Amino acid sequence: MSNNPGKLIIFEGTDGAGKSTQIKMLANYLRSKGLDVIASFEPTNGPYGQKIRQLYTDRNKVTRNEELELFLADRREHVNKLINPAISAGKIVLCDRYYLSTAAYQGALGFDVEEILQRNSFAPTPDLALLLQIPVEDGRRRITSSRGEETNDFEKAEMLEKVSTIFNSLSFPYIRHINACQSIDNVQRDIIMQVKQLLKMA
């Protein structure tokens, strides 16, 4: 076990906010400072995560309760196999989506947000949650522009408006709001400022 305490930094927000791009940039920055960084994402590439991805094109395959159970099972495996061991080893874990996304997206489908959060109590609390904020329609335009395809069921405007409302209602002390409407470099600047404060970097 490392003498240096590991950290869990998560990136949250509606689709099209630029989370994946910002995680790559932050990982490169932290590694350039000599820090041991692991970048991960949810849903994972594990068996449960792959089943979740299949739902992006056909959500009629499972009930909403079964869908939620898949997210929980995928996260439990992620926590046990990667997140907890990495934190114990003193590494910095950057994660693209975590349980706040489950609360927001499944909450938008009608589940009780507090109940979802309670059911995720097995997962370690993030040291920092960077909530990238962008108007829903701007995010949808980014999705179709980058992928060259239509949005899926999780990315419809009405759904994302509900998701955004839930994200904004969350008031945990580890959440920091980031304006994702800025240039990529300016978004990264704001993210680095928050991360430096967390890691007590000069």
From Swiss-Prot:
- Tell me the InterPro entries matching this sequence: P-loop_NTPase, Thymidylate_kin-like_dom, Thymidylate_kin_CS, Thymidylate_kinase
Q: Name one Pfam family in it.
A: Thymidylate_kin
User: What one GO molecular function would you report for this record?
Assistant: ATP binding
Recorded GO cellular component terms are: cytoplasm
Gene3D superfamilies tied to this protein = P-loop containing nucleotide triphosphate hydrolases
* Keywords on record: ATP-binding, Kinase, Nucleotide biosynthesis, Nucleotide-binding, Transferase
Q: Which residues form a coiled coil?
A: none
Q: What is its EC number?
A: 2.7.4.9
Q: Which reaction does it catalyse?
A: dTMP + ATP = dTDP + ADP
- Source organism per entry reads Desulfotalea psychrophila (strain LSv54 / DSM 12343)
Q: Which family does it belong to?
A: Belongs to the thymidylate kinase family.
Protein name in UniProt: Thymidylate kinase
Residues binding ATP, per UniProt? G13, T14, D15, G16, A17, G18, K19, S20
Domain of life here? Bacteria
PANTHER family in UniProt: THYMIDYLATE KINASE, UMP-CMP KINASE 2, MITOCHONDRIAL
Q: What does this protein do?
A: Phosphorylation of dTMP to form dTDP in both de novo and salvage pathways of dTTP synthesis.
Disulphide bridges: none
Q: Which CDD domains match?
A: TMPK
In the record, biological process GO terms are: dTDP biosynthetic process; dTTP biosynthetic process; dUDP biosynthetic process
- Source organism phylogeny: Bacteria, Pseudomonadati, Thermodesulfobacteriota, Desulfobulbia, Desulfobulbales
